[in-house]
Amino acid sequence: MNWITKIIKAGEKIKSAIHKRATKEDIANSDWTSCCKGPILKKDLEKNLWVCPERECNKHHRINPKQRFDILFGKNNYQIFKTPIPKDDPLDWTDSKSYKDRLKSARKKTGMDCGMMVVSGTINDIKITAVASDFDFLGASMAAAEGEAFLYGIQYAIENKTPFLCVSAGGGMRMMESLISLS
C-alpha cells in the first residue's frame, strides 16, 4: 500500500469517527439554545421573555410575531387576521435564486403567507390592533404583501376605533419588487 492510499484510508476513518453536524432544522427544533455562558433551555428563556437570564449578558433573543403577541396579549389571547396577498413576483425577478423560490422557502420556514402578522387583542381591557414583522421572512423587508397587511391593520383599527401598534423587526424595501414594494 502506498502513502497516498494510507492517507485516504486515514481520512475515511476520521470522517466516520466524527458525527454528523446538526442541521438548521435540528437546531431550531431543539429544546436548547445558546448564549453567553453556553446552552440555555428554551423554556427558561421563554419564562424570562426571551432575554438571557445571566445578569451580565441580558441579550434579547430574536422572537417571531406569534411569540411577541403571546407576550403582549397573553398566550393565544388574540385574533389573527388573514390579509390579502398580491401576486407573487410581479417583475419575474431572478438572481442566484428566483424570488418565487425565496418566497416559497420563507413561507415554509415561518408558516406565514407574508412577513407581517396582523392581530387584534386586549391589554388591560383596551382593544388593540397590532402588526409585527418576522425577520425570518426575508429579513422582514417590506414588499407589496407586507404593505397590504399593514394597510389592513390600519383600516381595521380605524373602523373599530382601536389604537394601532406596529412592531418592526427589520427594515427597508424588498429589492425584488423594486418600486412596487413602495406602493
Language model features with spans:
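Terminal-region recognition feature
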Residues: M1-S183
